[in-house]
Amino acid sequence: TNDTPSIQQAIDHVSAKGGGVVVVPGDDSFYGKRYVATNIRLKDNVELRIETGAVIWQSPRPADYAYDVVYGHDVSIPGVNWTHAASCHNMPLIHGDQVSNVRVTGGGVIRMQDAGGENLDSVSAGSLWTGCPYKIHLIPLGFFRCENVEISDVHLRRTNNYHINLRTCR
């Protein structure tokens, strides 16, 4: 199941009340409690607390996304020199745009779709991009034109992209 709508509804509710904490609870199982997500948008005065034992897992299913995803690393946009799918088309997994006082905390995991992790040698250039054209590349955490952003005590795993993108934040 796609847990994005439930998480987003909780964020929207907390923000409408003036702010607070949205808790993504974990458990003590070996792999943690999984929440499949596509694009979670933080709002003013909201902390997203991904607790220890919780895993926000990037959905591999295009049908879960609210937009048409682009696969792979590079895409073609006429007139643009370097076009990375995660930077110019696909939305970050967790993001904020022109928001203030947002936090992502809690000790949990943000787990992406890596490229090459299915290979024995997932480091060298020859195998690193194996499977890349078939993956939905997202930036795990992206904040744009925001103020007072805190990212602490979260673990980013198996990302195929920039881990954190902060643009014109103060």
Kindly give the residue locations of the regions a language model identified.
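Extracellular/periplasmic carbohydrate-active domains that bind, remodel
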Residues: T1-R170
